[in-house]
Amino acid sequence: MINFFLDRAEAAGYEEVIPPHLVNEDSARGTGQLPDKEGQMYYMEKDDLYLIPTAEVPVTNIFRGDILPEGDFSHKLCGYTPCFRREAGSYGAHVRGLNR
């Protein structure tokens, strides 16, 4: 099923990327995960890094800090990653996050 969706995305012009599974605090803050979702994220104190709660965090940070040339704004990226997060509320307790 994963390959089916990735193939469809690539056919629609998206480029598949393999993002990292660990991000720094700036990356998590820049995508709105911190401070709002801090209690749901896994933090590795020794390395000062967070496990990604969703692929969106590293994918949206790929061009962070870059100045893109005029007319070069149409990057279409997709990626598949494991997602590491504590499930909040009763939704996660009942299905253990398997539906997400």
Enumerate the language-model features and the residues they cover.
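TRNA-recognition modules of translation machinery and tRNA-sensing kinases, especially anticodon-binding
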Residues: I2-R100
